[in-house]
A protein has these predicted regions:
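Targeting-peptide/extracellular-domain and disordered-appendage signature
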Residues: 1-193
Length: 193
């Protein structure tokens, strides 16, 4: 028997991410959160939030829907990373494309007036399905999520042909092999009614 989630659906799409560092346990030298949104109150679109030594340690935001990028900052992305609640960070207009086969590798391409960016995940691990409810202990996050996470033991970020320092690091998640870098497909976020 099917069960409908009792919470309000606020977005669905994809949210692959990169968290690179030069040594395991060091602060991230690159932190990148990429969204391909199919549905949310501010409409569909793409956005990349990225901070790296290649951005001089400052957040850069690239999007093809500024309203969606700002809505994410005020909701889910702002919850995931409080630094991104700052809606004074400029949003740079960009175009987006993808390539690859997620069983082997995946690349997201972002082009803007000042940057040609590629994010690539490879050495792909076994997918896992995660489902949390809004305000569920122990994290007590305001929003719940249902997503297919695909860990990547290899990943890189390039901006204008230069590769960011750092690598992904192995982690465990729910007792399964995971990484600091992953693809996140079929991702839906909910809030309590």
């Amino acid at each position: 028997m099917a069960v409908a989630d009792p919470h309000r659906l606020i977005l669905t799409g994809e949210n692959p991410f990169l968290r690179l560092s030069e040594k395991d346990g060091d602060p991230n030298s690159t932190d990148a959160s990429y969204w391909r949104i199919l549905f949310c109150p501010a409409g569909p679109g793409h956005v990349l939030y990225v901070k790296s030594e290649m951005t001089h340690g400052h957040w850069r935001i690239y999007s093809d829907n500024i309203a969606m990028a700002r809505w994410l900052q005020q909701t889910v992305q702002g919850m995931l990373n409080a630094e991104l609640k700052d809606t004074t960070i400029p949003v740079i207009d960009a175009s987006f494309s993808k390539s690859g086969d997620p069983r082997y590798f995946w690349t997201e391409h972002i082009k803007a007036h000042d940057a040609d960016i590629a994010m690539t995940w490879y050495d792909i691990g076994e997918p896992l399905l995660i489902h949390t409810e809004p305000n569920q202990p122990p994290q007590n996050r305001q929003y719940g999520v249902c997503t297919v996470l695909v860990p990547a033991m290899g990943a890189r970020l390039t901006i204008n042909g230069n590769q960011a320092r750092g690598t992904p690091w192995k982690r465990d998640r729910e007792g399964r092999p995971f990484s600091t870098c992953a693809l996140a497909f079929s991702e839906s976020w909910t809030e309590a009614r």
